[in-house]
């Protein structure tokens, strides 16, 4: 009796070549719908599943393979009892199942797709066959990825059958395939129901490997980069690398931090990042001007940094960036002139992320902890000027207010405890990741130096004492923005009034760990 392969695929890549190879090896082909039509058009002998089951496809193709003559043929073990039952029921064994599933993830990635369209692309029969074959991998081969076709054909030609090790490996890939598929469906429905249940009882997460990384944060740590199902344009996972060396784990961490910061602004902004903290951020009328200001904010730290711009990189900005060593640049796009200039920096990694809107579509932030993970909403809070509360005798002037709002937007992207000193839409000093707030302020003010005179200061959380205000006053800071809410707020307010500093409370905290 010849061996039988059941083939039913949405992705027709390599289909005809695989099927022809199986026929040449003497295999009988079973197939359904569009797959069968493709094989017949290629001149290959095919038995349609309906001829095996004696039952036609029904319900617009929703029911094709859900039949004992199919699943019995897949699930039967090579035992005398099972083989006898197959013979009694007139069922022939199926030895190889080649299935990939309806393009659900591709469907939900389309702009404007409706729930009805998404639901129609939820495969039922396909996952059932995949799981059945994977469960019975002791006897049955299961192939879900066209990239495996050549390997399978080669082994069948050389050995006549698939080894137990190969079948086990293919089964593992098949179970991962259906798990990721179901996870994408679950995530889609969670998204639809998010207003009713923002944190579901079961949180499903899956990813598709983009690439193995050379190592993790350190050379002794392994690492890989995974993409969530159907990432929208404007995200790091959806970005295209245009040139440069292979991305590292640390590159990706810094690129994400830089891109999220730059995209938080509507006007042209450039952010330069080191170890996920900004070292220079500036807004200006053009990308090139913003880059020069961001670089000048801290040229020492900018060396070897990651740059993000929320506007297309043009030739002028590209030329400015060639003057120092940078690890990577991410932007919506790069003009042809910019690409021609940056080509001389062949190791510089360039990423085109597409439209900026996508970088604010992250639904959850997920952090691993021992034995589990934490989930929270992203910090996308936008501060409205009218919500600010002036708590000092002096109100901020218009120019000070503009700088306060700029510094406040930057400080939420700095590791806590965080202090940002800024003036004219440029950061002058950033104190990040300190165990006490006055220590963060001291770092930011020392970095700003004489430039702190006439500048503003932003704090990601309230001042527990008046010492930070006193330190700011001594450096010449004229206005402060902070959440407020300390039991000693009056101490900070008195210190500000004594120095003639304008201070506003936001009522919102921006801790970042």
Curated annotation (Swiss-Prot):
Claim: Transferase is one of the keywords in the record: yes
Gene Ontology annotations for the cellular component aspect, listed alphabetically: cytosol
Alphabetically ordered keywords of this record: Hydrolase, Multifunctional enzyme, Purine biosynthesis, Transferase
EC number(s) recorded for this UniProt protein: 2.1.2.3, 3.5.4.10
Transferase keyword on record: yes
Any one biological process term the GO annotation gives: 'de novo' IMP biosynthetic process
Entries under Pfam families matching the protein: AICARFT_IMPCHas, MGS
An MF annotation (GO) of this entry: IMP cyclohydrolase activity
PROSITE patterns tied to this protein: MGS
Pathway(s) where this gene product acts: Purine metabolism; IMP biosynthesis via de novo pathway; 5-formamido-1-(5-phospho-D-ribosyl)imidazole-4-carboxamide from 5-amino-1-(5-phospho-D-ribosyl)imidazole-4-carboxamide (10-formyl THF route): step 1/1; Purine metabolism; IMP biosynthesis via de novo pathway; IMP from 5-formamido-1-(5-phospho-D-ribosyl)imidazole-4-carboxamide: step 1/1
Catalytic activity: (6R)-10-formyltetrahydrofolate + 5-amino-1-(5-phospho-beta-D-ribosyl)imidazole-4-carboxamide = 5-formamido-1-(5-phospho-D-ribosyl)imidazole-4-carboxamide + (6S)-5,6,7,8-tetrahydrofolate; IMP + H2O = 5-formamido-1-(5-phospho-D-ribosyl)imidazole-4-carboxamide
Domain called MGS-like: residue spans: 1-144
Domain of life: Bacteria
Free-text note regarding domains: The IMP cyclohydrolase activity resides in the N-terminal region.
Entry similarity comment: Belongs to the PurH family.
Name assigned to this protein: Bifunctional purine biosynthesis protein PurH
Taxonomic source organism: Moorella thermoacetica (strain ATCC 39073 / JCM 9320)
Taxonomic path: Bacteria, Bacillati, Bacillota, Clostridia, Moorellales
């Amino acid at each position: 009796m010849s061996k039988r392969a059941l083939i039913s695929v949405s992705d027709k890549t390599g289909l005809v070549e695989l099927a022809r190879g199986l026929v040449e090896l003497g295999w009988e082909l079973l197939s359904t719908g569009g797959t069968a039509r493709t094989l017949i058009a290629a001149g290959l002998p095919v038995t349609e599943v309906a001829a095996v089951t004696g039952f036609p496809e029904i319900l617009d193709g929703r029911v094709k393979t859900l039949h004992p003559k199919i699943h019995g043929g897949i699930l039967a073990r090579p035992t005398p009892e099972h083989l006898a039952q197959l013979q009694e029921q007139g069922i022939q064994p199926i030895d190889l199942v080649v299935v990939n599933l309806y393009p659900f993830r591709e469907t939900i990635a389309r702009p404007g797709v409706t729930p009805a369209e998404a639901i129609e692309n939820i495969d039922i029969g396909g996952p059932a066959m995949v799981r059945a074959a994977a469960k019975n991998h002791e006897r049955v081969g299961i192939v879900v990825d066209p990239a495996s076709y050549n390997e399978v054909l080669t082994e069948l030609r050389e050995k006549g059958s698939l080894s137990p090790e190969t079948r086990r490996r293919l089964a593992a890939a098949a179970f991962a395939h259906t798990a990721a598929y179901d996870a994408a469906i679950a995530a889609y429905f969670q998204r639809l129901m998010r207003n009713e249940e923002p944190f579901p009882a079961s949180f499903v997460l899956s990813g598709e490997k983009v690439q193995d990384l050379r190592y993790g944060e350190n050379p002794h740590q392994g690492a890989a980069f995974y993409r969530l199902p159907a990432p929208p344009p404007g995200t790091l996972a959806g970005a295209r690398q245009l040139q440069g060396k292979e991305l590292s784990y640390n590159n990706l961490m810094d690129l994400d931090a830089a891109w999220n910061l730059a995209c938080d602004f509507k006007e042209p902004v450039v952010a330069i990042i080191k170890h996920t903290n900004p070292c220079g951020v500036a807004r200006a009328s053009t990308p090139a001007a913003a880059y020069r200001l961001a670089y000048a904010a801290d040229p020492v730290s900018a060396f070897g940094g990651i740059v993000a711009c929320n506007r297309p990189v043009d030739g002028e900005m590209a030329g400015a960036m060639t003057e120092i060593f940078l690890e990577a640049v991410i932007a919506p796009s790069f003009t042809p002139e910019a690409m021609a200039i940056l080509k001389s920096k062949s190791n510089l990694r360039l990423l085109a992320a597409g439209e900026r809107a996508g970088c604010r579509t992250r639904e959850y932030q997920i952090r691993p902890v021992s034995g589990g993970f934490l989930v929270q909403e992203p910090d996308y809070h936008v501060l409205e000027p009218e919500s600010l509360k002036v708590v000092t005798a002096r109100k901020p002037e218009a120019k000070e207010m503009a700088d306060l709002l700029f510094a406040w937007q930057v400080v939420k992207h700095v590791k806590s405890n965080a202090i940002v000193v800024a003036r004219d839409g440029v950061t002058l000093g950033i104190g990040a990741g300190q165990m006490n707030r006055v220590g963060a302020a001291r770092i930011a003010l020392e970095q700003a130096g004489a430039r702190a005179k006439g500048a503003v200061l932003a704090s990601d959380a309230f001042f527990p004492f008046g010492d930070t205000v006193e330190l700011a006053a001594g450096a010449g800071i004229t206005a402060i923005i902070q959440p407020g809410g300390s039991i000693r707020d009056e101490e900070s307010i008195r210190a500000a009034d004594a120095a003639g500093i304008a201070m506003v409370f936001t009522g919102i905290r921006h801790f970042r760990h």
